[in-house]
Amino acid sequence: MIRFITLQNLMDYQVTLKLMEDYVNKVINDNEPEIVYLVEHSEVYTAGTNYKQEELLNYDDIPVIYTGRGGKFTFHGPGQRVIYPILNLALPNRHKDLKLYIKMLEEWIINSLNYFGIKGYLIKDKVGIWIKVNKGEFAKIAAIGVRVRKWVTYHGIAINISTDLCKFNGIIPCGLESSLVTSLNQLGIYVEMSEFDKIIQTEFNKIFK
């Protein structure tokens, strides 16, 4: 069974990135086992490889970090569960298929949200997990941005639990309007992070065996 490691306290993004990159190297070079990091970051905007500078609107005192993951701008901060699976897609029980990997991540999060009676949706040409809200509009509850080095995955998923959604006003997240972002709390679901973690671990083990 793949081990989940919960990093305590609010984590600096760059410190966590270094931790991820170091462990990816260990998986590649030393055959270290696969793991999943569970993180809650201090406030930060991150930009993926497809970002456009005009999508950074007003970031005040929140730092901006340019990363190597896929995607555009997003926000990380307190109340958001960030999940970093470091998996070796070259193993015999895996597939060297990035699209399949992302599909499995999507299925994992949709199944986890279903536990709370929330139906997650996929939208064509838009990465992430979406929730149907007022008047048939869709709001994003989970962002996905990954990177692979020698078929070892890192970066991952950010799910809004009790996130301050106003912080998304400083960017156009994932190239979308900030009004199209939601959280479990905004949907009327209040859950402790530790309880949410138990659910995602259970659902993970059903998909990534």
UniProtKB/Swiss-Prot annotation:
Subcellular location, in the record's words? Answer: Cytoplasm
Keywords, ordered alphabetically: Acyltransferase, Cytoplasm, Transferase
For this record, an example GO cellular component is: cytoplasm
| GO BP annotations listed | protein modification process
Indicate yes or no for the key word Cytoplasm. Answer: yes
Q: Which InterPro entries match?
A: aa-tRNA-synth_II/BPL/LPL (IPR045864), BPL_LPL_catalytic (IPR004143), Octanoyltransferase (IPR000544), Octanoyltransferase_CS (IPR020605)
Q: What class of enzyme is it?
A: transferase
- Output the PROSITE patterns linked to this UniProt entry: BPL_LPL_CATALYTIC, LIPB
Q: Which residues hold substrate? A: 69-76, 143-145, 156-158
Which reactions appear under catalytic activity for this entry? octanoyl-[ACP] + L-lysyl-[protein] = N(6)-octanoyl-L-lysyl-[protein] + holo-[ACP] + H(+)
Q: Which EC number(s) does the record attach to this protein?
A: 2.3.1.181
Its main subcellular localisation, reduced to a broad class, is cytoplasm
Active-site annotation: 174 (acyl-thioester intermediate)
Q: In which pathway does it act?
A: Protein modification; protein lipoylation via endogenous pathway; protein N(6)-(lipoyl)lysine from octanoyl-[acyl-carrier-protein]: step 1/2
Q: What HAMAP family is this protein classified in?
A: LipB
Q: Other remarks?
A: In the reaction, the free carboxyl group of octanoic acid is attached via an amide linkage to the epsilon-amino group of a specific lysine residue of lipoyl domains of lipoate-dependent enzymes.
Family, per entry: Belongs to the LipB family.
Function summary: Catalyzes the transfer of endogenously produced octanoic acid from octanoyl-acyl-carrier-protein onto the lipoyl domains of lipoate-dependent enzymes. Lipoyl-ACP can also act as a substrate although octanoyl-ACP is likely to be the physiological substrate.
> What is the official name of this protein in its record?
Octanoyltransferase
List the gene name: lipB
